[in-house]
């Protein structure tokens, strides 16, 4: 599959985005297709990765941003959660729509998250956790 380079608009999610972000995250981490890409956790963890109510709770936390990457048409293609705690910022829920994986969007999201955390939260250190069953990460 060819990789298409696209310019993205990065913005914090709003309540109206929660359903679309839930669909994105679940498609990236818990796809129905057994032949899914490397990000799939289907064989490791049962059930959906998130839901709109959980995402709304993230949005309502102080010093928290669910950063979205939107294409020119406005469709959400990726996300990453940033949450500040004192001088640290925690990065999580990095997800890219399966059709865009391998395009460099994940890297762009991490770069944008780093800039956001420094600019908006004054973070001095960024921390990223991965699921312990993924020893290759």
For each of these PLM feature ranges, what is it?
Residues 96, 102-115:
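Conserved acetyl-CoA-binding loop-helix of GNAT-fold acetyltransferases
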Residues 48-68:
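A short helix-loop-beta-strand connector motif used in the catalytic cores of GNAT acetyltransferases and
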Residues 68, 75-83, 90-95:
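Conserved beta-strand in the GNAT
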Residues 101, 127-137:
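Conserved beta-strand-loop-alpha-helix junction that forms the acyl-donor binding cleft
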Residues 13, 94-96, 130:
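Hydrophobic adenine-recognition pocket in adenosine-nucleotide-binding enzymes
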Residues 110, 117-130:
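Conserved GNAT acetyl-CoA-binding A-motif
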Residues 26-55:
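Conserved GNAT-fold acetyl-CoA-binding loop/helix
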Residues 1-19, 23:
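Conserved N-terminal entry element of GNAT/NAT acetyltransferase domains
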């Amino acid at each position: 599959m060819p990789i298409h380079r696209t310019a993205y608009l990065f913005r914090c999610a709003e309540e109206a985005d929660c359903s679309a972000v839930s669909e994105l995250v679940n498609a990236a981490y818990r796809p129905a297709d057994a032949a899914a890409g490397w990000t799939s956790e289907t064989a490791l963890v049962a059930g959906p990765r998130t839901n709109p109510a959980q995402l709304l709770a993230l949005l309502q936390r102080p010093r928290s941003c669910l950063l979205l990457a939107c294409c020119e048409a406005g469709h959400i293609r990726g996300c990453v959660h940033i949450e500040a705690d004192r001088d640290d910022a925690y990065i999580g829920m990095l997800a890219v729509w399966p059709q865009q994986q391998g395009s460099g969007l994940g890297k762009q999201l991490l770069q944008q998250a780093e800039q956001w955390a420094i600019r908006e939260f004054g973070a001095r250190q960024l921390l990223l956790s991965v699921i312990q069953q993924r020893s290759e990460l």
